[in-house]
Structure formats: structure tokens, C-alpha cells
């Protein structure tokens, strides 16, 4: 059976030929590059905003020929406009990356070469270290008893505890935890590995602790909705897919009760997983595999957090000590 064609994009600021190529470009990124729907949505939004800007900047609808003749000053003006809107540096980097990708796609398709895009330097982004939680705090966030006083149904409290236990216990992204199907999560004593689908639909195997599986099983036994094997294991209050925002709100309530900083987010549990493994002597390459990072340089950011431990190792092991 052939795949359904992607819906045609309509643009008020650009010629239909641009809209057609934009549709083909996003379809290509989804099918060939396996970019996530959220990334495709962001790339599409960035290109729309650029085309809207150029239409206003030039005083005419953007055509393929005009876009191919784009000048560096046009791109810089667009980036300056976005920066004036207080857009973060990382978002500006993504916008420029998307525009360059679209330009390369047009060139490969013989629609023209947008040379100006390669002449623009990517905006500088200050690197900030992840903010892991202390080990005791991370454990409390994954403890169902900490939620006992909340005025919510007990099965929902058990669900939230199970999700956070997976984030900290296996280093999952929140999208990965909520994307797990019931058949993919073993019962306690029947397995100790999860097969997780991460960014770019790449799968990886991660170990899971038996006490974490016990929390998941406790939630499953309390859940009032049927949880078919091929359906998501975590569901919302009405039995539908569980939104990441619900877990974020649960974290906000709990960090207030526990006196934790605003940096205590669901993703901070993943950071804590990596940092605590490293502090206990975990191998950086093994942690890279567990996190699903394609590049070791991404994982190496955690060495900055744990520099104190590395200095201790140096002091105790250096041959000239």
C-alpha cells in the first residue's frame, strides 16, 4: 500500500511553487532523515516566519527565483528581527539550520542555489551545564509515598511516581517514557531491559531496575482503564494518551512540597541519572549508549558537572602523587 501524500502547504507570503517545495522538503526530512514530528513542525514554522518576513521586507510574494537570489543582508535582517522578539539563541540556530536544509534541498532538486545561507555565521549560544538533583531528592521524586497528601486519585499518583522512576532509573526522555507500549515493559522478575524508541526513531536497549518495574506494575494494577499490549502503558485521567505537560505539572506540585528549585523538572531526572552514574564511576561511553546520544561530545557535558570527582581521582591516582 502506498503512503498517503503529505497535505499541501498553503502560504500567503509565497508563490505556490515555494509551498510545493516546502511540502516536499518536510516530507523528505520525515521519511529520509527520520526527524521527529516536533522538529518538522519547528522547521516548517521557522521557514514560514522567514517567508513572511521576506514578503514584507521585499514588498512582494516570495518566488523560487527570488528566494534563490537571497542575499546575506536579507538573512541577517530576518535573524535580527527574530532576536528582537527575544528568541533564544538555540531557536535562532535551529531556524538557520532549517533554512540551510531547505536551501540544500532546492539545490539538489535543481531549483537554484541559495549561496547566501552558507555565508551566515550561526549565532553563538552560551553553553549551560545541566542541573542535576541531589541523589536523595531524585529518589524522593520517584517515591509514591511523597504524593500521599495530594488530592488526586491514587492510581494517578501511582502513575506519576512510575513515570518519574523511569526517568531517573533508566535515564529516559519524557517522550520516551510516555511512548512505551505495555508489551514493551516487562513485569517484575520477567526481564530487566527496555527497548526504547528515541530521537529519529532510533531504538536502544536500557536496563531497568526491578523496584522501578514494581512501581510500574503497581500503577498498572490500579489503573481503571484497559491497557492493551499494543497501546501506551501510561494513560491520562480519561484513558487517552498521557501528555508530557501533565507530568511537568505533577513535578511542579511536588517540587513545591519538597522545597526543590525550579530546575527540578522531569528532564532534570535524566540529567541526574547520567551525573549520578558518572559520580559512581560509570564509563562515559556506556552512559552515552544509555542516554541514546549520537555523539560522545553531547555526553561529555556531564564531566563538567562531576569535575570534583575527577579531581579526586587525579589526586589519588596520579603517579607523581
Curated annotation (Swiss-Prot):
GO CC terms, sorted: cytoplasm; Holliday junction resolvase complex
Positions of the Core-binding (CB) domain: 16-107
Main location: cytoplasm
Keywords annotated in UniProt: Cell cycle, Cell division, Chromosome partition, Cytoplasm, DNA integration, DNA recombination, DNA-binding
InterPro entries named among the record's database cross-references: CB (IPR044068), DNA_brk_join_enz (IPR011010), Integrase-like_cat_sf (IPR013762), Integrase_catalytic (IPR002104), Integrase_recombinase_N (IPR010998), Integrase_SAM-like_N (IPR004107), Tyrosine_recombinase_XerC/XerD (IPR023009), Tyrosine_recombinase_XerCD (IPR050090)
Compartments where located: Cytoplasm
Active site: 173, 199, 267, 270, 293, 302
Domain Tyr recombinase: 128-315
Biological processes per GO annotation: cell division; chromosome segregation; DNA recombination; DNA transposition; resolution of DNA recombination intermediates
Any single Pfam family the record assigns to this protein: Phage_int_SAM_1
Molecular-function GO terms, alphabetical: DNA binding; tyrosine-based site-specific recombinase activity
Source superkingdom: Bacteria
Family, similarity comment: Belongs to the 'phage' integrase family. XerC subfamily.
Subunit structure: Forms a cyclic heterotetrameric complex composed of two molecules of XerC and two molecules of XerD.
Entry function: Site-specific tyrosine recombinase, which acts by catalyzing the cutting and rejoining of the recombining DNA molecules. The XerC-XerD complex is essential to convert dimers of the bacterial chromosome into monomers to permit their segregation at cell division. It also contributes to the segregational stability of plasmids.
This protein's name: Tyrosine recombinase XerC
Species per Swiss-Prot/TrEMBL record: Bradyrhizobium diazoefficiens (strain JCM 10833 / BCRC 13528 / IAM 13628 / NBRC 14792 / USDA 110)
Amino acid at each position: 500500500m502506498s503512503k498517503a501524500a503529505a497535505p499541501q502547504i498553503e502560504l500567503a507570503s509565497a508563490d505556490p511553487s515555494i509551498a510545493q517545495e516546502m511540502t516536499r522538503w518536510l516530507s523528505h526530512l520525515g521519511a529520509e532523515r527520520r526527524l521527529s514530528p516536533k522538529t518538522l513542525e519547528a522547521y516548517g514554522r521557522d521557514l514560514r516566519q522567514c517567508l513572511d518576513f521576506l514578503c514584507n521586507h521585499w514588498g512582494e510574494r516570495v518566488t523560487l527565483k527570488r528566494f534563490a537570489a537571497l542575499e546575506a543582508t536579507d538573512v541577517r535582517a530576518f535573524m535580527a528581527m527574530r532576536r528582537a522578539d527575544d528568541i533564544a539563541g538555540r531557536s535562532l540556530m535551529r531556524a538557520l539550520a532549517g533554512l540551510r536544509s531547505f536551501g540544500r534541498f532546492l539545490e539538489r532538486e535543481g531549483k537554484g542555489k541559495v549561496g547566501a545561507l552558507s555565508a551566515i555565521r550561526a549565532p553563538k549560544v552560551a553553553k549551560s551545564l545541566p542541573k542535576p538533583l541531589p541523589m536523595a531528592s531524585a529518589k524522593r521524586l520517584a517515591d509514591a509515598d511523597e504524593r500521599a497528601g495530594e488530592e488526586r486519585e491514587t492510581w494517578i499518583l501511582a502513575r506519576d511516581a512510575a513515570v518519574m522512576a523511569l526517568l531517573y532509573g533508566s535515564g529516559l526522555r519524557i517522550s520516551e517514557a510516555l511512548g512505551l507500549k505495555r508489551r514493551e515493559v516487562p513485569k517484575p522478575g520477567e526481564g530487566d531491559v527496555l527497548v526504547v524508541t528515541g530521537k529519529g526513531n532510533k531504538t536502544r536497549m536500557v536496563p531497568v531496575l526491578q523496584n522501578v518495574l514494581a512501581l510500574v506494575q503497581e500503577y498498572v494494577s490500579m489503573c481503571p482503564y484497559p491497557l492493551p499490549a499494543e497501546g501506551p502503558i501510561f494513560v491520562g485521567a480519561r484513558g487517552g494518551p498521557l501528555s508530557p505537560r501533565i507530568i511537568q505539572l505533577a513535578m511542579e506540585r511536588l517540587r513545591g512540597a519538597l522545597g526543590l528549585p525550579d530546575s527540578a523538572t522531569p528532564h532534570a531526572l535524566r540529567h541526574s541519572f547520567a551525573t549520578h552514574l558518572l559520580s559512581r564511576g560509570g564509563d562515559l561511553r556506556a552512559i552515552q549508549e544509555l542516554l541514546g546520544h549520537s555523539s560522545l561530545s553531547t555526553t561529555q557535558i556531564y564531566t563538567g558537572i562531576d569535575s570534583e570527582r575527577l579531581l579526586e581521582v587525579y589526586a589519588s591516582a596520579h603517579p607523581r602523587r
